A protein has these predicted regions:
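Bacterial N-terminal signal peptides that target proteins for export
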Residues: 1-9
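Bacterial N-terminal signal peptides
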Residues: 9-19
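Lumenal/extracellular ectodomains and adaptor appendage modules
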Residues: 20-134
Length: 134
C-alpha cells in the first residue's frame, strides 16, 4: 500500500513538474525580414509573420530607434487584406476596435508598431514600413 501511495505522489509531482504547452498563448512560428537600403540611408523593411494567435487584442514590434530616425509608410496586411492605418494607436482599445487596424504607439524608449490580431487562430501578417533619416 505504501508503494502505491508513493507512486501516486510521484505521478502528481511529475504531472505538474513537466512543462505543458500553453494552449491560449500566441506563437510566432516564422518571421521573414527583408530590408531595402536606399542611397540616402533610409531603409524599407518588410516583415512576414506566420503563427498561431489565440489571445489578446494586438501584436506589436518594439522599435527602439535613435532620435535621427523616423518611421513612415506603415502598412499591415493579413491573409484577408490590408489594414487601416490609424494616426493615434490606443493600447486600451477592445479587440473589435483594433481589428483590421495598425498604428504607432509612443513609448519611453521609442515606438511600437501595433496591429490588431483581428481573428484568432493561424494568421499570416505582412508588416511594411520605412525608416527615414531626419
Amino acid at each position: 500500500m505504501r508503494k502505491r501511495v508513493s507512486g501516486l505522489i510521484l505521478c502528481f509531482v511529475l504531472l505538474f513538474a513537466i512543462p505543458l504547452p500553453a494552449f491560449a498563448s500566441n506563437q510566432v512560428n516564422t518571421i521573414d525580414i527583408q530590408a531595402l537600403l536606399y542611397e540616402d540611408g533610409s531603409m524599407y523593411v518588410t516583415q512576414v509573420w506566420k503563427g498561431d494567435f489565440n489571445e489578446g487584442t494586438e501584436s506589436y514590434i518594439p522599435m527602439n530607434v535613435p532620435d535621427y530616425l523616423t518611421i513612415s509608410n506603415l502598412t499591415v496586411s493579413d491573409q484577408n487584406g490590408i489594414y487601416d492605418t490609424v494616426p493615434d494607436w490606443n493600447i486600451d482599445w477592445s479587440f473589435e476596435e483594433k481589428a483590421r487596424k495598425c498604428g504607432m504607439n509612443d513609448t519611453d524608449s521609442g515606438y511600437e508598431i501595433c496591429f490588431g490580431i483581428s481573428r484568432y487562430g493561424q494568421n499570416h501578417y505582412t508588416i511594411e514600413y520605412k525608416l527615414d533619416i531626419r
